[in-house]
């Protein structure tokens, strides 16, 4: 197949990061997969996204109107101009295949593939398929899933794992973080708290309240990535020796430091924690579309790699209970770490590209 392949990775970091991971593979092995070029297609607002600051290929920036309010009524009219630009541009770039990573911003690329009979492939990161996947599954040649779909969703595809960027992948795939936690070798357990790029006030406040427990503070050391908008607020309320960080472009050192991760349950964070063999305490974002974070967390918990706290408040009771239960039982963390690592797929990016372009149905 000659021509180019385009990866529509526009919306949030959960769509962008795995898309860039696929681009890394394609950029390195273009001829092996039958293409002359690879492009990323992303929203202009994502120009400062860390994953797109040093991309493995050219990024085509675009704008597409968002749904919501009165714009929903006039959406077809608002969509026409950017879509016409997409058509002319993609024809010039000789786009032969489109990989949609999900989210409304992938709509122009997907429609182009359908209308002009190009090959369409979809990646679904969550246990609950998003609207893009549900609507356009029947038009796609193949679909790659990061996790098994939740009960009630029947879409043909292959579960491979969420593609992870090379710069995040640990150099040595093992669970060294939790091998030395038994008495006499390590007195404290490192807990990494991830609120995401925009932060999560609920998680920050829950951790600060948890640290007020003397048994917790004597056994566990906390590092909070608060999100830039919540850094000052969290820092001012911190009374213990927690390490407060606004945001980290390079997550590898933080994962290597951690023994446990407390986080939301977006697919990207889950995939990264899995490749580091980290036990997880997951607090799903309750307002995520189709409650997909809840289903993601339920899957991780059902496999034994983490536990879930379903809460919309910052009440620390359940978190304190979990941490106290683990305090003198390092074997629990080691076992969860083994399960976490077993669920990971560090080669998901390559396997996804191979599934799309070399494997036969």
Task: For each feature predicted by the language model, list its residue ranges.
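Active-site-proximal region of nucleotide-activated glycan assembly enzymes
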Residues: 36, 114-175
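A short, well-ordered alpha-helix in the C-terminal region of glycosyltransferases
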Residues: 332-346
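Conserved nucleotide-sugar phosphate-binding/catalytic loop shared by glycosyltransferases and other
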Residues: 5-10, 33-77, 310-312
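Acidic donor-binding loop of glycosyltransferase active sites
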Residues: 95-97, 256-270, 278-279
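Donor-nucleotide binding loops and adjacent catalytic segments primarily
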Residues: 27, 39-41, 45-55, 170-176, ...
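C-terminal "capping" alpha-helix adjacent to the active site of nucleotide-linked donor transferases
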Residues: 303, 308-310, 314-331
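C-terminal alpha-helical cap of glycosyltransferases
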Residues: 345-361
């Amino acid at each position: 197949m000659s021509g180019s392949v385009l990866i529509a990775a526009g919306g949030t970091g959960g769509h962008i990061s795995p898309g860039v991971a696929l681009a890394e593979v394609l950029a390195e092995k273009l001829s092996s997969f039958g293409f002359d070029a690879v492009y990323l297609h992303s929203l202009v607002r994502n120009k400062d996204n860390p994953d797109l600051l040093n991309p493995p290929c050219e990024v085509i920036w675009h704008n597409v109107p968002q749904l919501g309010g009165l714009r929903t009524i006039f959406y077809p009219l608002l969509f026409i101009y950017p879509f016409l630009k997409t058509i002319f541009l993609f024809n010039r770039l000789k786009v032969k295949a489109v990989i949609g990573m999900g989210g409304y911003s992938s709509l122009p690329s997907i429609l182009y593939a359908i209308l002009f009979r190009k090959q369409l492939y979809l990646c679904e990161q969550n246990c609950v398929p998003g609207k893009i996947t549900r609507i356009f599954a029947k038009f796609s040649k193949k679909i790659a899933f990061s996790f098994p779909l939740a009960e009630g969703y029947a879409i043909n595809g292959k579960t491979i794992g969420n593609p992870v960027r090379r710069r995040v992948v640990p150099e040595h795939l093992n669970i060294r973080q939790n091998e030395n936690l038994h008495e006499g070798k390590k007195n404290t357990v490192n807990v990494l708290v991830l609120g995401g790029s925009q932060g999560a006030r609920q998680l920050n406040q829950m951790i600060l309240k948890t640290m007020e427990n003397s048994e917790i503070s004597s056994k566990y050391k906390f590092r909070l990535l608060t999100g830039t908008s919540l850094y000052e607020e969290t820092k001012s309320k911190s009374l213990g020796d927690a390490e407060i960080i606004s945001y980290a472009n390079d997550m590898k050192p933080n994962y290597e430091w951690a023994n446990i991760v407390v986080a939301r349950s977006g697919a990207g964070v889950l995939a990264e924690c899995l490749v580091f063999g980290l036990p997880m305490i997951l607090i799903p974002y309750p307002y995520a579309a189709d409650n997909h974070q809840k289903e993601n967390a339920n899957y991780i918990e059902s496999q034994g790699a983490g536990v879930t706290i379903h809460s919309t408040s910052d009440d620390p009771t359940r978190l304190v209970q979990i941490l106290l239960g683990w305090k003198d039982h390092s074997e629990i963390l080691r076992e969860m770490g083994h399960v976490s690592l077993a669920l990971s797929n560090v080669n998901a990016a390559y396997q996804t590209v191979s599934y799309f372009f070399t494997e036969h149905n």
